């Protein structure tokens, strides 16, 4: 097991052997210091010591307390579709993490044309603009400034703040917190001893808690009196890049596939493909938000010897599109959020709009 894999098992509460206990003890002091700093930061915003900026449109924030994947991107896409179905012009504000323009404030898509590549803007805003036709996306480390740019040039009716739970500088009218249904708080400790970006008490800032990756049954009782609902994820198909139609994953059964993913928990993606009955002869995990340069492409070419196709996530697909001529046929999967009890979410949206 890699060091990263061991740490993730420790931080999620899955690893509790002697080595895990020793490492946990070593990390306890920096975790306590980190927790104190982020608690004081949140307190400064709550008490008005740090300035909170307001945009002249409703802002819906989607975020989490833990590092790693809780399904933020599928949730943002789901919300965007629901809002657009209500006739709203929707703009997503994203940081642009991993793109060459990270730190700049730029429009990624005006709802008609995607003007920046994934290499420039990062994978998530480009993937969202690609998968939700008509969605406007902007990037900026300062989300307030990015929102002002969108107001000036795009005139949206509502904003979705992607990964915004800790971006306290921007006021939000609806604060949605996503939590993994199976391990909502990991081992309950802050970084680097656990998965938490903030202490558990930060749950109180949420207006709605959505438990993700639920398969049925009751959700954990982490949310207290805060309204909550459950949601699951489903791979609903795959599209041949660059612009093929989405087809059922069953169409790939009987062929030999190589899977790759540069996401927080790639093994979950690989397992989902196998559950769909796909013959995955090699599964290659890359770093989260991998850039897919020469090294990654060479790795894929070597692994694909004797295979029929490559298959990856939607976020990875927007980056692999630049290398299609050098690879086997590449399929990008479609991952959808499916609320199991959507009434609390719809009620929360009604209050904002």
Swiss-Prot record:
Annotated InterPro entries: LpxK (IPR003758), P-loop_NTPase (IPR027417)
Pathway in which this enzyme or protein is active: Glycolipid biosynthesis; lipid IV(A) biosynthesis; lipid IV(A) from (3R)-3-hydroxytetradecanoyl-[acyl-carrier-protein] and UDP-N-acetyl-alpha-D-glucosamine: step 6/6
Disulphides: none
Source superkingdom: Bacteria
GO molecular function, one term: ATP binding
Cited SUPFAM superfamilies: P-loop containing nucleoside triphosphate hydrolases (SSF52540)
GO biological process, one term: lipopolysaccharide core region biosynthetic process
UniProt keyword ATP-binding present: yes
One GO term describing the cellular component: plasma membrane
Pfam families xrefs: LpxK
Entry keyword set: ATP-binding, Kinase, Lipid A biosynthesis, Lipid biosynthesis, Lipid metabolism, Nucleotide-binding, Transferase
Residues the entry annotates as binding ATP: 66-73
Role of this protein: Transfers the gamma-phosphate of ATP to the 4'-position of a tetraacyldisaccharide 1-phosphate intermediate (termed DS-1-P) to form tetraacyldisaccharide 1,4'-bis-phosphate (lipid IVA).
Matches recorded under HAMAP family: LpxK
Protein name according to UniProt: Tetraacyldisaccharide 4'-kinase
């Amino acid at each position: 097991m890699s060091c990263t894999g061991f740490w993730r098992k420790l931080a999620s509460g899955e690893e509790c052997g002697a080595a895990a206990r020793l490492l946990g003890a070593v990390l306890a002091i920096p975790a306590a210091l980190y927790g104190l700093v982020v608690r004081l930061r949140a307190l400064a915003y709550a008490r008005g010591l740090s300035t909170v900026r307001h945009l002249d449109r409703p802002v819906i924030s989607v975020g989490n307390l833990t590092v790693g994947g809780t399904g933020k991107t599928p949730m943002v896409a789901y919300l965007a579709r629901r809002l657009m179905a209500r006739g709203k012009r929707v703009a997503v504000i994203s940081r642009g993490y991993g793109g060459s323009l990270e730190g700049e404030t730029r429009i990624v898509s005006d709802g008609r044309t995607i003007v920046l590549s994934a290499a420039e803007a990062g994978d998530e805003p480009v993937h969202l603009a690609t998968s939700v036709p008509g969605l406007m996306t902007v990037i900026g480390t300062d989300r307030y400034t990015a929102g002002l740019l969108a107001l000036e040039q795009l005139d949206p009716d509502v904003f979705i703040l992607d990964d915004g739970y800790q971006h306290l500088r921007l006021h939000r009218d609806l604060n949605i917190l996503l939590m993994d249904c199976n391990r909502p708080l990991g081992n309950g400790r802050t970084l680097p001893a656990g998965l938490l970006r903030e202490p558990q008490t930060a749950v109180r800032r949420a207006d709605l808690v959505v438990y993700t990756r639920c398969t049925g049954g009751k959700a954990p009782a982490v949310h207290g009196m805060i309204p909550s609902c459950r949601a699951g994820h489903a791979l609903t198909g795959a599209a041949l890049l660059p612009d093929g139609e989405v087809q059922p994953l069953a169409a790939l059964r009987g062929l030999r596939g190589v899977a790759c993913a540069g996401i927080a928990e790639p093994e979950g993606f690989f397992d989902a493909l196998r559950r769909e009955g796909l013959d995955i002869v090699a599964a290659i995990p890359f770093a989260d938000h991998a850039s897919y340069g020469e090294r990654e492409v060479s790795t894929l070419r070597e692994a694909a010897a004797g295979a029929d196709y490559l298959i990856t996530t939607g976020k990875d697909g927007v980056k692999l599109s630049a290398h299609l001529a050098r690879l086997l046929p590449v399929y990008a999967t479609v991952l959808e959020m499916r609320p199991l009890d959507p009434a609390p979410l719809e009620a929360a949206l009604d209050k904002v709009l």
